[in-house]
Amino acid sequence: MPNLFYLSHSTDGWQNLATDEWLLDNLAPDEMILYCYINRNAVIIGKNQNPWKECNLGAMEADEVQLVRRITGGGAVYHDMGNLNFSFIAGEDLYDVEKQMNTILQTIRMLGIPCEFSGRNDLLAEGRKFSGNAFCKRGKICQHHGTLLI
């Protein structure tokens, strides 16, 4: 079982989310990857969201903010250079959301920041949300991706 890590050097939201989806579609069932990336200014919307209802598209165009749709549900989020994004992608036999969340929590705690899991998908530090997470499955491959305010 190969465990892989990939850090994108691109800050293009379209490229990074396309890579995220490509990894989901092309990973072998016996593999697991942690993919990390940072996007320059972008609004990332969930798969079922209407961009005309969620975004001020004129202001986004004027401010050169990308609009990117992700493959998971959930609400719109703003990405910029202060936001680290991660994606755990694994065959269903290796996929363990609790273990993946604990990996993130333990890493944040190693930085001296007390944090906890809350609700369905959120991570909190001192009662404030610093990470939202979403999930999907295609065939025998599962994905858990999220954001971290840095």
Task: Give residue ranges: language-model regions.
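Active-site loop/lid in soluble adenylation, ligation, and acyl-transfer enzymes
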Residues: 1-51, 135
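Short beta-strand
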Residues: 34-37, 77, 115-117
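ATP-binding N-lobe of GHMP and related small-molecule kinases
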Residues: 39, 45, 55-61, 83-85
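A glycine-rich, hydrophobic loop/mini-helix early in the fold
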Residues: 62-84
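Catalytic beta-strand/loop module used to bind and position nucleotide/cofactor moieties
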Residues: 81, 85-150
